[in-house]
Amino acid sequence: MAMKIRLARGGSKKRPFYRIVAADSRMPRDGRFIEKLGTYNPLLPKDSEERVKMDAERVQYWLGQGAQPTDRVARMLEAAGLREKAERNNPKKGTPGKKAQERAEEKAAKAAAPAEEEAAAE
């Protein structure tokens, strides 16, 4: 059975409230789940302790059983210190794109041209 630790939406329209649950990945998002592990209320301030509540012991148990947290739940677990932060490798993120590199080269060429003229005049 492929287990997931994920959010199941509750609450009324425009007033979301989520349960953090351990569920079979083939079940519907708000459908049958095996165990409720906690709650998440996005309407509360980010620094509120009531915003995310979870039973750390049961979460560790399900992670030990091979349950995979969804991306959002994984972030919550990292913030709570229940899981190590996943390293992401994106080496090209910091490098400028082709057009930005061309603009930088043109700017450098324009800046170098007057300096060369001054050196030749002396």
Curated annotation (Swiss-Prot):
| Bias type Basic and acidic residues, positions | 81-90, 99-109
**SUPFAM superfamilies recorded for this chain?**
Ribosomal protein S16
The record ties this protein, via Gene3D superfamilies, to: 3.30.1320.10
Q: Which InterPro entries match?
A: Ribosomal_bS16 (IPR000307), Ribosomal_bS16_dom_sf (IPR023803)
Q: Which UniProt keywords apply?
A: Ribonucleoprotein, Ribosomal protein
Q: Mention any Pfam family matching this sequence.
A: Ribosomal_S16
| Superkingdom, natural source | Bacteria
Q: Name one GO biological process term.
A: translation
Record's family? Belongs to the bacterial ribosomal protein bS16 family.
The identity of this protein, by name, is Small ribosomal subunit protein bS16
